[in-house]
Amino acid sequence: MEQTELESKLLALLTQPMRMDEMRRALPETGKNELKNALDHLIADGQVMKNKKNRFAVCTHYGCVAGTYLATERAFAFVAPDAPTDGAKPDDLFIPPGANGGAWHGDRVLVKLSERKNNRGRREGTVIRVLRRADRELTGALVQRGNAYFVQPASKKYPEVAIDCHHLGDAQP
């Protein structure tokens, strides 16, 4: 993501949670709509979060990190965190079974870090939000179970997808 000057200022400012009015006082030359648009962009990109008290801060303040979801053919996955500005590549995060938050391979996600590490010493996390979906073209076999239809993806990195019988067209299992 190309950051604007305002977004860079906000990231430097939001190391501690702040309300919108506090940000406006700290950046008096910035219009309300301009500030809101920059904040919305940073939130959508997984760099800033808003807490329940309507305070904004960088995601790391809340123990979260954004990255790319990397599914495996088994039930667990990894997230490759975004590289920080200092260039050091952070270790991948382990996502245990059931903690994928509906993410699929290649999605950009926001992960809440856990304090514990897995048995290999990797940090664990839970996907709390899918920020951006990866491409959704999927190749697989159509299967029928009773009255239900599913596509079994060719790659086990993807889950089965339920298909409404009205959307089958001419496809047959």
Report each predicted region and the residues it spans.
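Charge-lined substrate channels and their catalytic hotspots, especially those that engage the 3′ end
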Residues: 1-173
